């Protein structure tokens, strides 16, 4: 397979009709919108958006390109032994009438201060940051740890909360409904 350091090269290719977006979170919407504009079907990993503005942007793009498939993936939906089993139990009424759901996640890793470092030669730090605010390179700012920096992600809420809120909504048959969470704070979503 061909490898590119710039996603736009993939979007230019006429022989590609579907893209799978598995980038750091802050890139999801920009690439997804540009992929739809390029006529590509899109599969994007969670979290789909980090802000309400991004949500509105992708909604408009999906409405404009309704002839294209647009899917958001979360791996917990395919875990047959845990989450699918729990969803089936709720949907069959085995747990009674569910009145309230609390989704809990533990805190994000903390630490630092993290030292400024030289950018590894194989990393295009400017491209990696993309539309995020320009910052000096620190090893703990990219790769897996990007999730704990709000320039690039939403912390544990978008990293794990997206999974657990999705499972609760799925179990309660709320995924297709216009109703979402009624209250959100730093520790609870009801």
Label every PLM stretch briefly.
Residues 1, 9, 79, 90, ...:
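N-terminal Rossmann-like dinucleotide-binding module
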Residues 6-7, 22-23, 47-48, 73-76, ...:
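Active-site-proximal beta-strand/loop segments in catalytic clefts of secreted hydrolases
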Residues 15, 94-97, 180:
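Short loop/turn motifs at secondary-structure junctions
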Residues 20, 99-102, 129, 185:
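Residues embedded in well-ordered beta-strands within globular domains across many folds
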Residues 126-190:
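Rossmann-like dinucleotide-binding domain that binds NAD(P)(H)
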